[in-house]
């Protein structure tokens, strides 16, 4: 349903934000703020509304508005398609079967019992069926068998990659459209566009924070990595 509704709501949103007459009235109020006495709440509301319109293309010229409309409409189709593929791929691999009881070692008994009951309902009594949407973390954390943990991790990590629900091409298109949209609105990247409304404000500030944390956190991270390696050897 969202695949049908999303383009319609996007068109409606564009019709509102790109309405020249409506934005002129908003801009008139915004530009007059310096000479008016607004309380804090009203001033914030005016700023938020103006910013929302500006971030959705209201300041663009007519030609760029049409480009913005086209980009928005394409994204309105691709974005739910991406999510739909993720959901379908998740459903496809959701039932994880284990037939060897020895591979269950370490998994809490309550989860083993639930998997056994599910297997019975599926007509495979004597096996265990784990729903990965709820049991993924349990298997990875508690299962003693390394090959099982690896198998589950690979299954979850390879969703929508090279199969019937492959999202690779969709991701490329979304990435390019987001970049083009950000450029159109005066931002270097999509990250800059998004972060402009967040505490970080820009990707450069994010990179600076990461760089500032690298040196003081490196030694502890290395120790944690060594501890994990040692723990993995113990499990083997």
Named regions from a protein language model:
Residues 204:
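Catalytic adenosine-cofactor/nucleotide-binding cores of aminoacyl-tRNA synthetases and other
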């Amino acid at each position: 349903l969202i695949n049908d509704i999303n383009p319609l709501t996007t068109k409606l949103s564009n019709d509102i934000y790109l309405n020249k007459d409506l934005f002129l009235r908003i801009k008139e109020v915004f530009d007059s703020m310096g000479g008016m006495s607004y309380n804090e709440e009203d001033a914030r509301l005016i700023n938020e509304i103006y910013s929302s319109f500006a971030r959705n293309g209201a300041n663009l010229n007519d030609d760029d508005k049409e480009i913005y409309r086209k980009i928005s409409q394409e994204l309105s189709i691709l974005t739910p398609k991406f999510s739909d593929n993720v959901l379908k791929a998740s459903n496809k691999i959701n039932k994880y079967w284990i037939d060897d009881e020895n591979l269950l070692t370490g998994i809490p008994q309550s989860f083993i019992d639930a998997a056994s009951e599910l297997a019975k309902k599926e007509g495979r009594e004597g096996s265990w069926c784990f729903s990965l949407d709820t049991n993924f973390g349990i298997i990875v954390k508690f299962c003693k068998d390394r090959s099982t943990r690896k198998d589950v991790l690979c299954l979850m990590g390879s969703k929508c990659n090279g199969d019937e629900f492959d999202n690779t091409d969709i991701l490329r298109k979304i990435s390019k459209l987001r970049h083009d949209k950000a450029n159109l609105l005066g931002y270097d990247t999509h990250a800059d566009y998004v972060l402009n409304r967040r505490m970080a404000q820009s990707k450069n500030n994010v990179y600076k924070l990461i760089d500032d944390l690298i040196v003081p956190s490196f030694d502890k991270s290395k120790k944690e990595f060594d501890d994990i390696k040692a723990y993995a050897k113990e499990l083997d």
